[in-house]
Amino acid sequence: MDEIDNIILHSLRQIGCTLDDEVTSLDEFSPTLLVQVVSKCITLIDSSLDLPRTLPPGMAQRFTATASLAEACRTIGYRRDIGYQTFLYSNVAEVRRVLMFLIERLPKESADKAAGTGQPLDVTTELESRICASLQSQLQAPWMPEFCRTAAGPSSSQIAFRRFVPRKLNIPFVTQGDIAAEVKEFWSRQASLDTLDEDSFIPSVIAANDGALKASGGAIDEVDRIKVCSPVDRLQRFYTSSEQKSSVVPVGKVAVEEKLDALAIVEAARPGKTPLESLQEEIDQIRVEIERAVGEGTGLEGERMEVVELCEVQRAAVGKLKDEKKIKERTHILLEDPEVNVRKLQGIIGAGGERMKKLQDQWDVHRIPLEQELEGYRVKHSDKLSQSQQIVDQIEATRHKSEEVMMDLQTKSAMHARLQKELEKLNRTVSRTAYTSRILEIVGNIRKQKTDIDKILQDTRTLQKEINTITGQLDRQFTVTDDLIFRNAKKDEHAKKAYKLLVTLHSDCAELMALVQETGAVKREIRDLEDQIETERSRNTAANLAQICRDLAEMQSESQRLEESLRAHLR
């Protein structure tokens, strides 16, 4: 039955019924959900019927709505017993029969909805299909630059090739001829590019740059006509400037090295070597000088760090010496006039003792009342301390219990996560082919059971025929035996006793057979009663009776409220 319920739930989700993922069987169907599902199915079967979509809150309206649904089911061809109790006080068997009938009567376009994938059309599946379709369309579309794309999206039929057109800055009255040049310049300086929109920003900047180049007379074409100095000319100018400096600055080690370097560069730049080779030699010499300067800088940095560490050590030593100096100065001051200093110290010590005594008296004045008050509070709250201790013990016990519960919760959470992963790995949406194969398997099992039942019935009939045959033979043999013994019973005393025993045996056998037949009948009645009990249990009679009692009480309360409102209205 679980597989049949899964097939029914799968079909209901395919036609658009709103079912939660937690609903896995028909036992979890509430009256409200059952009314919604049945109304949806009947609407798809016959859209001309006016049916309630949901279950009303009032009991009278509920009876009316469910009765109309039952009448609609009978209208579309349901032949079994159905009424308001099927929806309000239903059992799983009746709900299964009704839903199977409705699913069989669904139109083919509704029944085959989403059959291409064999999966339910939930929100996640629909979103994934839309994302896949969008990605596929984007991958199939040709690539275009950003400025060639239209607002409607990259489509081959909507490509618009737009040429670049610069725009002037949005400065008022700049193009007018009667405005002074100073005013135009002021407006150009004060106009902010932040106020422009995105379409005019870059073209305006380019237009402003073109205007500045034009005003300075530096056209782009004139750049090619600028004479670029060759490396030889630059080296000759450097050599000339170095000679002029050497005539003014005293000759030193650095000046001599610079002169030698310049001479080497000039010698390298003389005819016989290309300008590129001369520049390469100059670069090599400069690189050597840089490496030498870096090495000297590294050495100086190490010396600087050593000097800094030495300074730190000297500062620490100076601090210690200053502290010792202060102590020795104070000792020296005391030793200059010992008697006077001793008297001063004794006076200070005496004043400190008197001050300590006064402070002790003041402390006692405040301490004694506070201690008495504290003792009173301690006695007063001794019971509360014991209660607090009990509460602390309870809290500790509760803490231990909560720790145990947390450990148990962690274990169960880990188990739940593991089971959830295993559940996600399983294929929850079985295809229609699997359902069909399972249905065919169930049909095959039913046919096999029918064959077994027919075989049992045939064996029973054969056995009954054999029993009837043997019974007939036994009756005939008894009749013949009775006749023979009865003839001899008149002459022989032993034959007479045998005849009596034969009659007794025959009556006992007949009684025994009657008892066996009655026992079989009683067993059949017991099986019938057990089947009836199981049927009544499956109908949830007790739960339905309790629900009927609650609905009756609710209807009585509604009737009482209506009567009271009617009386109040009549008054």
Swiss-Prot record:
Any single GO BP term: positive regulation of ubiquitin-dependent protein catabolic process
Coiled-coil zones: 406-434, 509-571
Descriptive protein name: Coiled-coil domain-containing protein 22 homolog
Sorted UniProt keywords: Coiled coil
Lineage of source species: Eukaryota, Metazoa, Ecdysozoa, Arthropoda, Hexapoda
UniProt keyword annotation of Coiled coil present: yes
Classification via InterPro entries: CCDC22, CCDC22_CC, CCDC22_N
Entries under Pfam families matching the protein: CCDC22_CC, CCDC22_N
